[in-house]
Amino acid sequence: ALIGIVGRPNVGKSSILNRLMGQKIAIVSSKPQTTRNRITGVLTQGEYQLVFFDTPGMHKPKTSLGKYMVRSVNESVGGVDCCMLVVEAGKEPGDTELNLIEKFKSMEMPAILAINKIDTLKEKEELMKQIARYSLLYDFDAVVPVSAQDGNGMNELLDELRKQAGEGGHFFDDDTLTDQPERVIVAEIIREKILRLCDREI
């Protein structure tokens, strides 16, 4: 199954992808807009193969780079079997989430809602209210609270994603982890370290 990972910047999309894959595929930083390429993670377990498109966060583009990144998100939503919408625990749905949900509706897109950063919530009631709000907005195939930070909920999320895999064949060889060349991954990891050292986006 082709899975598009979508959501606003800095909700933990890349961290979730890295958790699901079990190793670093996508660059992770607190700086906005660090994911520039549609990095693909390929997870093969027996008959299941999940191909992940990790998209840049949705935002209103101010630059030509920003426009390219938003176009990349739109393309990801268009060509996948299922979308995983990642939102931050305790945060109200905003324009980004509502726009993506409208896209899901227009395409009748199977979608899974991953509520990340549940480790930051003090009250469980906040989470229950958030799940109820999103359930009114769209008929998600599953809603899974997770923490990419400590790994909570990742097995449940993977189970739900596997259900989307269906009977389709494998797109990649079983030992493939990403379609990004190794030198690109190395460059991304170096860029992540630079971003952590610098106060502003490179």
List PLM regions with ranges.
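Conserved nucleotide-binding/hydrolysis micro-motifs of P-loop NTPases
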Residues: 32-34, 56-59, 89-93, 118-121, ...
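Conserved G1/Walker A P-loop phosphate-binding module
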Residues: 1-82, 87
